[in-house]
Amino acid sequence: LNTWNPTEPFEPSEGCGFTITAIPIPHRSELSDNHALIIRGEERSLLFMPDQDSWSKTLVEDLDILEWLRSMDIDIAFIDGTFWDHSEISHRDVAEIPHPTVVDTLSRLGKKSDSAPEIHFTHLNHTNPLLDNGSLQSEELVSMGWEICKQGSIFYL
């Protein structure tokens, strides 16, 4: 049995060709802690971070999102896209369900440059207009160079 120590790379089975590292991410900790996973293959690395409270709590040393991803050598990132904006949840207190909105994330990211990692938005709430590929919101996100996770996609690391 292998023991997994958070923040240290873990190889699920010897010679499998990749490691997994858990990194703590601020998100409602009432029942347990929350971690993102970095999966490093032989050529590329992927960050899986479907849940977080806010970018201001997640980002360290005042880095912006892209600097933060580069500091961890991330090539592909799956990030929290729960809500497009707060109008989706006007009937609830946003403080009860903290997530950065896609609008906030896009304002921090700007348009994708050639050197930026791939970013895919995941963990979409059923109210999120990104679920409709033909929505204006989906078109805006894609026109900026970012992506929406699609079930069945394959990523080579």
Regions found by a protein language model. Name each.
Residues 1-2, 144:
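A generic structural motif
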Residues 45, 53-153:
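Cap/insert and terminal regions of metallo-dependent hydrolase folds
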Residues 2-68, 152-157:
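Core dinuclear metal-dependent hydrolase active-site scaffold
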